[in-house]
Amino acid sequence: ALWKNMLSGIGKLAGQAALGAVKTLV
């Protein structure tokens, strides 16, 4: 279950980073 929590955490960070990049580009 630990790896699932890690993946979910990484996914959230990646999502925030992607949104930040999109906002910067736009």
UniProtKB/Swiss-Prot annotation:
State where the protein is found: Secreted
Q: Which GO terms describe its cellular component?
A: extracellular region
Q: Which InterPro entries match?
A: Dermaseptin_dom
* Tissue note: Expressed by the skin glands.
Q: Which residues carry this modification: Valine amide?
A: 26
Enumerate the UniProt keywords alphabetically.
Answer: Amidation, Amphibian defense peptide, Antibiotic, Antimicrobial, Secreted
Coarse class of the primary localization is secreted
Q: Which GO terms describe its biological process?
A: defense response to bacterium
The record's annotation in Pfam families points to: DD_K
Cited function: Has antimicrobial activity.
**What's the family?**
Belongs to the frog skin active peptide (FSAP) family. Dermaseptin subfamily.
* Stated name of the protein: Dermaseptin-J3
- According to its UniProt entry, this protein's organism is Phasmahyla jandaia (Jandaia leaf frog)
